[in-house]
Swiss-Prot record:
Domain of life: Bacteria
GO MF annotations in UniProt: DNA binding
An example Gene Ontology biological process: DNA restriction-modification system
Oligomer and partners: The methyltransferase is composed of M and S polypeptides.
Protein name (record): Putative type I specificity subunit S.MpnORF365P
Record's function text: The specificity (S) subunit of a type I methyltransferase (MTase); this subunit dictates DNA sequence specificity. The single R subunit has multiple frameshifts and is probably not expressed.
SUPFAM superfamilies: DNA methylase specificity domain
Family: Belongs to the type-I restriction system S methylase family.
Origin organism lineage: Bacteria, Bacillati, Mycoplasmatota, Mycoplasmoidales, Mycoplasmoidaceae
Species this protein is from: Mycoplasma pneumoniae (strain ATCC 29342 / M129 / Subtype 1)
Induction field: Detected at low levels after 6 but not 96 hours growth (at protein level).
Cystines in this chain: none
Keyword ATP-binding assigned: no
Keywords: DNA-binding, Restriction system
Record field: transmembrane: none
Length: 268
């Protein structure tokens, strides 16, 4: 924190000399407090690393189980695959304009999903219900190409696309997992805001094994995803607790430094 404040930026190459480093003055609390703060900071690093590792593990197994070659290794070399475009197997719709003011004025139990990716994409809850059943949503703007499986009553904003499977050969959950891998590849990043339009989504081609196998794979991935999410959700809670601890000690240190300065001024 302190060393960067003493870097000489007037040179062509900014530098911090050994002489200047030796002259930096630092205030220290008791060794016990120092060790406590160091432990909290170490925990931050460990939890962040674990969070990244959990997400990598899930992505690896998801991609492995959805790979055609691996499906044939597991379920049989002669397993047939059929290829469809999204428009051939789904009804494709888009949400409507739902403002934050509308959400405030029409509170209810049904979620409104938007182009947000945090909080499962939920913007708020209203009494309306535009969709009821098993669907897939995707973000069309901003964080475009993020796919969610939905099951129940909900609403979608205008930045959210909605798919309803109409082909009896297709498992909605399985399709959602496939699209989580494939949809981001079709995001248009040249615009000021990344986009994945209804037209582009409609043209995406995907290959499917028989329905029975789709359902087996989807059940495995759904259970694994839930397990990973439960673990991952526990990590941010731990991080938040550690942050509160760190804030406490930062405030303690600040007050301690101020007290030292006041005492020094009184002596002088």
């Amino acid at each position: 924190m302190e060393a960067p404040k003493h870097v000489n930026n007037a040179c062509v190459i900014p530098n911090l000399t050994l002489k200047k480093m030796r002259e930096i003055e630092l205030d220290f609390p008791s060794k016990k407090i120092q060790e406590k703060i160091a432990t909290i900071l170490d925990t931050f690093t460990e939890l962040s690393a674990e969070l990244r590792e959990r997400k990598k593990q899930y992505a690896f197994y998801r991609d492995y189980l959805l790979n055609q070659e691996n499906i044939r290794k597991i379920y049989g070399a002669n397993i047939p695959f059929e290829t469809f475009q999204v428009k051939d197997i789904c009804e494709i719709r888009r949400g409507r304009a739902i403002t934050k003011a509308y959400i405030r004025n029409n509170p209810g139990e049904n979620p409104v999903y938007s182009a947000a990716t945090t909080n499962d994409g939920e913007l708020g809850r209203i009494k309306d219900c535009d969709f009821d059943g098993e669907y897939i949503t995707w973000t069309t703007n901003g964080y475009a190409g993020v796919v969610f499986y939905r099951n129940g009553k909900f609403n979608a904003s205008q930045d959210c696309g909605v798919l309803k499977v109409k082909n009896k050969k297709i498992c909605t959950k399985f399709l959602s997992f496939l699209l989580k891998i494939e949809a981001p590849k079709f995001v248009h990043n040249l615009a000021s805001r990344p986009k994945l339009s209804q037209k582009v989504m409609a043209e995406i081609e995907l290959s499917f094994p028989p329905l029975e196998i789709q359902e087996k794979i989807a059940d495995i991935l759904f259970a694994f995803e839930k397990l990973c999410n439960d673990l991952v959700e526990g990590i941010p809670a731990e991080v938040e607790m550690r942050k509160k601890q760190l804030d406490y000690y930062q405030n303690f240190l600040f007050n301690w430094v101020q007290e030292q300065k006041t005492q020094l001024e009184q002596i002088m």
